[in-house]
Amino acid sequence: MEFSAKWITGPAAVDRDSEVAPYFFRKQVTLPENVEHAVIYATALGIYNIFLDHEKISDSYFAPGYTEYNNRLQYQEYDVSSLLKEKNRFVLTAELADGWYTGRLGLCNKENCYGKKRALLAELHLTLSDGSKQIIGTDASFEITTDGPRRHASFFDGEEYDARINIDNASFVNVTEYTGTVPPALVPMQGVPVRLHEQLKPKRIFQDRDGITLIDFGRNMAGIVKIGPFTAKEGQKVVIRHGELIQNDKLYTGNLRTAKQTLTYTCKEGVNEYLPEFCYMGFQYISVEGMEVSEENICAYEIYSDMESIGSFHCSDERINQLQRNIVTSLKANFVDIPTDCPQRDERCGWTGDIAAFAPTAAFNMDITTFMKKWLADLALVQKEVGVVPWICPSNNFINDRTSNFWAQNFDQCDALWGDAATLVPWAVYQSSGDISVLEQQYQSMKAWVETEKRLADIAENDSPRYIWKHGMQLGDWLAPGKDMNDWTDCAKWTSTAYYAHSAQIVSKTAAILGKTEDAATYDALFHTVCQAFRDTFVEPDGHITDGFQSIYALALRFDLLLPEQRPRALRDLLDDIRTRGNHLGTGFVGTAELLAALSDEGKVQEAYDLLFQDTCPSWLYPVQCGATSSWERWDSLLPDGTINQSDDGPQDMVSFNHYAYGAVGNWLYTRIGGLSLVEPGYKTFRLAPAIGEQLTFAEVSHKCPYGTITCRWEKDALAEHGYTLKFHVPEQTRAIVTCPDGIQREYTSGDYVLS
């Protein structure tokens, strides 16, 4: 679509009067007679809401969304026909806050990363009964003020709202045309809107040691708090602070870094009600000062991109069920227009490594196809700009600012797993959805990433052989327990070479699917060459990996880096390491997703169960034992004595309690315990083969694939040792390959089945 309207903004005087208050635009509109259809198209430098006579036209949040603004900006389309019925005059208004464009962004902790001025572009398209059309667009006839009730709005810091202010009585001035830089491409909405979802009532209302009211909403989340209706005096001030934990009988906010996560509401006389519009917080607990709270006048809403829930998992052990709930909670909390690392501190960036590890788990639980295709398109754009896949996407404009800090200075460094998001994420989306367009969209990006890995692995450094990637800054086995940052990065030559091989294999498979036979052969040969180099460099003939560690053993087994005769020794070494640690895992971000499958797929199902059911630190169930309601960034974010981990083994204050990377274990819950794994993309053909361990008596899984909902439940037979009953449903147009209770593999077409 081509806009004929003008970009509008505030004059310099408006910005001087209030650098932090949202812009508020308005225009009186007189409608022609016989309007049959009305549509608003809108976008902004910032984040906006549009109103007709003070009625918000959409329930979405944070439009136009976060894209790589150096390259493109989304616009939205709203059908407002029903809102204009019976109207001949109305006030068209828009509120515009900083958002990602001019607001403070993570890692750099700077404002105005993409630009210094907010601006709005909008058109109202009217279709009359005679078929004629009229367009009313933003232009010099609009007015602007910053004297509205919302005095401040920031993703990290929250909002300040003064209910005593009536916007209709504010002092408006004429807008000015915005003539600055705008993103070169305006594109229709590519992703899915962010919306409010589950409402949470207080689970507990209590006081801290100073008598300040605290509220526990029962689980960690990304969301906002609504207050009201409640009666107050004019000028009464309500202050709400958000945090993930209570420590020493006080709300803990130390891990927020510089983010304030605070709502300040100044009351009008009488009945008050308030819901923020331009921020969200990461929290389970809040402190409230300035009002009497009850279950009736305060609640919280989870906020995340509007994706359909398509997967479920349940079993006989409530701790594992809580682990699954934690996985889904952190998925939702960190899918707020882009896949972020965390929803609470002053970061909230699109970290590529986190989603690379977590994508298969995410794709099972939610329909992430549209969400991820939008983000992947930006990944390809950033990759093209800087020549590599960076640590974060969108870039926070580090492309044009390399001086802010360590992350900006090293933005164009290449990193295994983080960079491999270019291959792993589109592959996971394609496998789950069967949507080949994601591979078509991303193929050049996928191929370019493997070529980058190839170039870096060919750099001779300290006499390293070809195809072994040792060059450059690497995060390595990030956050592996019992180690520090130097240890994590020292693991990189093993893990980066492993992911290099894996990505080459994915590109080969992708090329074959897309009919690019020459590329398929080229990258298949590269995969085998890198595997050979890995074995020649790191692996002894019997399969022992020199200076091996859990993550590299897991990757070597899962990525087929070893010869068949080497696998038994590698498996034995992995098991020995686990036993040496007292049946504890030792993996960081790069290996955790593959660890249990490396055991169970080599026949060590019970050993995998034993590791999953470990409940002392480090383990998946340790946070559950501590009462966690979301996935943690570190295995030991909370120490056994109940205090926050304040260690200095990484970036300062890096302790999030809502971080999905280690939740990647979910994929093993669904595919091995639940037994459901795909054979063909989109589950056109799927496998049902539960891996049954002694700790569970039943497990059930369901997944809504493009053809219908697959269900599978197994339950042990109390009367027969090793016996169990298998109930499953095969949707129309699909085929199931089932490992039956008698151990024989059979195929089933659509229908419901019970096997014993």
Annotate the PLM regions.
Residues 10, 508-524, 603:
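Carbohydrate-binding surfaces of carbohydrate-active enzymes
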Residues 354, 375, 418-425, 503-506, ...:
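Amphipathic, well-ordered alpha-helical segments in soluble domains
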